[in-house]
């Protein structure tokens, strides 16, 4: 600063007028004498300024050295006096002013009161925390309605702010588009060649040019023609919609037949006009049929078929499409059977064989595919159907069916014994006499067996008159039935040997004799000795399988019209018979009992053996710990409580606690519910798509929170809820107490305010 001031003084002095050198004898006047003195003063100042260059001395204030009447308050000194200067002495002359009186009062008030000392660190922190807590609680209390609303909402979808979709006009998209592939190049060439517009106006440039070239009359004719075409198009569309809604099978059959005739007629005309083209068309049709059959695209394993199968429950069009596809699949995969001349002479037409194959397909196909349990029965039925298409053999087939239906109503045990006896009589008549000793004690069952024997003899007489191939097929069927009988009797024998089932009062306590094969009759003769009490032979006891996979006998039918109850009973018996035939080869009951026995053993408490080898005795190869020591360190398990399924032979009740299921158990009433009955009623209602419609199922299983892919979920703002943001006013209490805070706390407050 001193350097700058010196430089300014030098510049000011340089601008003064230069001194003129005069001769030594030149006389000076009084005015000139004064100017000379002024010049010397200026020169003296210049020398002082030059000498002060480079020094760092402060600018010296000018001091008053002479006495004066006017005393200034800006430069008051107390030198020369023994007393100090007091403020009241200076204000003594200003007592009359009103403003000065107010200042005096303030001075007296300040003088009378002492200043409070600053707060220590602990108290300052406590005051800061209290102020921050009160203000923060006041700020957060505004969000209570928003939080409550979000908690009670059924579904929240984020992000909440819906951004308007930015749709760019097609002109901008088209300008930035660049052709990259040869296909795009060809498309663009065609568009520009035909002058197709970029946008989608009502008329193309070609149409506008043609309209402009037309006269008024031509335009009217053209307009009328277009109106007529639109009317015809609407008529055809309405007619097609009406035809599509027709559900008559007869109509669709006639329509399909008409289309087939029309196609055949067109093919004949094409054959007459151009045989080569007709051959090519025929070859194309055959090739298309071959490719469809090889690819098997009409099955239900494709993506389209799976999607249609999902919607078939709700959409009748999808159901119809699935039925058409299955019909097409059956038509393509059907084996074409060539009929020989001998079969044509016997009267076996091609239609009968195709119907049998259709019946086979219907029997073998179910919802998931081929049923392996029905293969044997279907094959036997198919053979019978192919052979018994002769009208002379139809009564025998009807009698066979009626005998089967009546056999379903009889007890199963009588049916088994009858089949075994009839099979023995057919295969070996000499050994049939050995079966006479295995009759039942009940007179009613004996009469039923006699009637059944008569019916079997009558059927045998009819079958003897048939051809040799029919006898061969019947022997195969009887052999399969014999195996079925043996398996069922063996399974009943195993059930009777079980200790758990023998305790039940529903099952007979006497043992069941295993059915004997043809080679076991010789071994049976020395064993069949009379009892000690009497010389009578033991008769075979009838098997009571009512508690197994059997149906109760239905009452005898009357010749009147069957009632609804009888029809329902017939359906039930047929269903149970189908189950028996399906599980004939599997020993389901034995496996079930084995599984139950294993479950009981695993859940039974086990003894704890605490004996350690090598403590108090020798240990090595071939040495076993003593039984006394094992008994000493053996902790026996407490007796378990009796199982709930102890007296239930066909039930397994698992008493093991499932940890995963226990995690989902409710120990307290959930948040939305207020009563226990309300919660239980809600839990009992099914939410699956098997019990509800598709729309209701989607509503019940909608997620609580829904998000969109690729969207950023930002925190909620006060502006979105309807509040005005006042972050600066929120810190007003904190900023008012900055004086009693430390520097570190003040810096933190500044950071908070700058962040807001």
UniProtKB/Swiss-Prot annotation:
It holds the Pfam family Utp14. Residues 21-44, 419-468, 497-539 are annotated as: Disordered. Residues 419-428, 452-468 have a biased composition (Basic and acidic residues). Keywords: Coiled coil, Developmental protein, Differentiation, Meiosis, Nucleus, Phosphoprotein, Ribosome biogenesis, Spermatogenesis. Residues 215-244, 316-345, 449-476 form a coiled coil. Its main location: nucleus. InterPro entries: SSU_processome_Utp14. Expressed predominantly in germ cells of the testis; weakly expressed in brain. GO terms for cellular component: nucleolus; small-subunit processome. The modification Phosphoserine is found at residues 29, 31, 37, 554. One of its GO terms (biological process) is spermatogenesis. It is found in: Nucleus, Nucleolus. The keyword Phosphoprotein applies. Essential for spermatogenesis. May be required specifically for ribosome biogenesis and hence protein synthesis during male meiosis. Apparently encoded by an autosomal retrotransposed copy of the X-linked gene Utp14a. Evolution of autosomal retrogenes from X-linked progenitors compensates for X-chromosome silencing during male meiosis. Belongs to the UTP14 family. This is U3 small nucleolar RNA-associated protein 14 homolog B. It comes from Mus musculus (Mouse). The gene is Utp14b.
């Amino acid at each position: 600063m001193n350097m700058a001031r010196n430089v300014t003084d030098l510049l000011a002095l340089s601008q003064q007028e230069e001194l003129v050198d005069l001769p030594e004898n030149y006389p000076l006047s009084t005015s000139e004498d004064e100017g000379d003195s002024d010049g010397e003063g200026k020169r003296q100042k210049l020398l002082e300024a030059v000498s002060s260059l480079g020094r760092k001395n402060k600018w010296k204030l000018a001091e008053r050295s002479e006495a004066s009447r006017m005393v200034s308050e800006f430069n008051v000194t107390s030198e020369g006096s023994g007393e100090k200067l007091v403020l009241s002495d200076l204000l003594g002359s200003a007592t009359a002013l009103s403003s000065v009186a107010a200042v005096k009062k303030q001075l007296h008030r300040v003088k009378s009161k002492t200043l409070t000392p600053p707060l220590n660190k602990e108290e300052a922190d406590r005051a800061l925390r209290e102020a921050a807590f009160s203000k923060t609680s006041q700020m957060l209390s505004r969000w209570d309605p928003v939080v409550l609303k979000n908690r009670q909402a059924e579904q929240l979808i984020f992000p909440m702010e819906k951004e308007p979709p930015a749709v760019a006009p097609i002109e901008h998209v088209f300008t930035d588009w660049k052709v990259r592939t040869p296909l795009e190049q060809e498309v663009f060439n065609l568009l520009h060649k035909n002058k197709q517009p970029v946008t989608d106006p009502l008329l193309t440039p070609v149409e506008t040019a043609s309209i402009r070239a037309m006269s008024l009359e031509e335009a009217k004719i053209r307009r009328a023609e277009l109106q007529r075409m639109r009317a015809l198009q609407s008529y055809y569309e309405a007619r097609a919609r009406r035809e599509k809604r027709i559900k008559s099978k007869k109509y669709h059959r006639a329509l399909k037949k008409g289309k087939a005739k029309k196609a055949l007629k067109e093919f004949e005309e094409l054959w007459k006009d151009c045989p080569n083209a007709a051959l090519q068309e025929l070859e194309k049709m055959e090739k298309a049929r071959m490719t469809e059959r090889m690819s098997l695209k009409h099955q239900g394993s494709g993506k389209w078929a799976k999607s249609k199968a999902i919607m078939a429950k709700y959409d009748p069009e999808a159901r119809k499409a699935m039925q058409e596809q299955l019909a097409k699949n059956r038509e393509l995969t059907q084996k074409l059977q060539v009929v020989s001349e001998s079969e044509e002479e016997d009267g076996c037409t091609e239609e009968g064989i195709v119907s049998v194959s259709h019946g086979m397909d219907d029997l073998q196909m179910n919802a998931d595919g081929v049923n392996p349990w029905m293969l044997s029965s279907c094959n036997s039925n198919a053979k019978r159907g192919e052979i018994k298409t002769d009208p002379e053999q139809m009564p025998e087939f009807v009698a066979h069916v009626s005998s089967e239906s009546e056999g379903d109503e009889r007890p199963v045990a009588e049916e088994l014994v009858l089949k075994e006896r009839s099979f023995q009589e057919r295969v070996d008549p000499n050994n049939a006499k050995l079966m006479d000793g295995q009759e039942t004690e009940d007179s009613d069952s004996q009469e039923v067996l006699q009637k059944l024997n008569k019916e079997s003899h009558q059927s045998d007489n009819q079958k003897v008159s048939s051809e040799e191939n029919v006898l061969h097929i019947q022997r195969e069927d009887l052999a399969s039935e014999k195996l079925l009988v043996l398996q069922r009797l063996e399974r009943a024998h195993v059930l009777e040997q079980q200790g758990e089932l023998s305790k039940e009062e529903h099952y007979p306590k006497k043992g069941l004799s295993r059915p004997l094969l043809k080679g076991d009759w010789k071994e049976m003769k020395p064993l069949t000795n009379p009892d000690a009490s009497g010389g009578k032979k033991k008769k075979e006891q009838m098997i009571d399988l009512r508690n197994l996979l059997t149906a109760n006998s239905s009452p005898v039918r009357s010749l009147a019209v069957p009632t609804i109850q009888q029809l329902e009973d017939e359906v039930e018996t047929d269903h149970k018979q189908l189950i028996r035939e399906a599980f004939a080869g599997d020993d389901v009951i034995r496996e079930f009992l084995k599984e139950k026995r294993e479950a009981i053993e695993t859940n039974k408490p086990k003894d704890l053996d605490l004996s350690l080898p090598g403590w108090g005795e020798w240990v090595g190869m071939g040495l076993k710990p003593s039984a006394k020591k094992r008994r000493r360190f053996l902790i026996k398990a407490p007796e378990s409580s009796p199982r709930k399924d102890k007296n239930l032979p066909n039930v397994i009740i698992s008493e093991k606690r499932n940890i995963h299921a226990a995690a989902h158990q409710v120990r307290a009433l959930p948040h939305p519910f207020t009563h226990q009955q309300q919660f239980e009623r809600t839990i009992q209602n099914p939410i699956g798509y098997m019990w509800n419609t598709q729309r209701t199922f989607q509503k019940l299983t909608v997620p609580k929170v829904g998000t969109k892919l690729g969207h950023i979920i930002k925190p909620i703002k006060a502006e979105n809820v309807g509040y005005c943001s006042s972050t600066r006013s929120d810190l007003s209490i904190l900023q008012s107490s900055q004086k009693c805070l430390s520097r570190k706390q003040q810096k933190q407050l500044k950071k908070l305010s700058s962040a807001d």
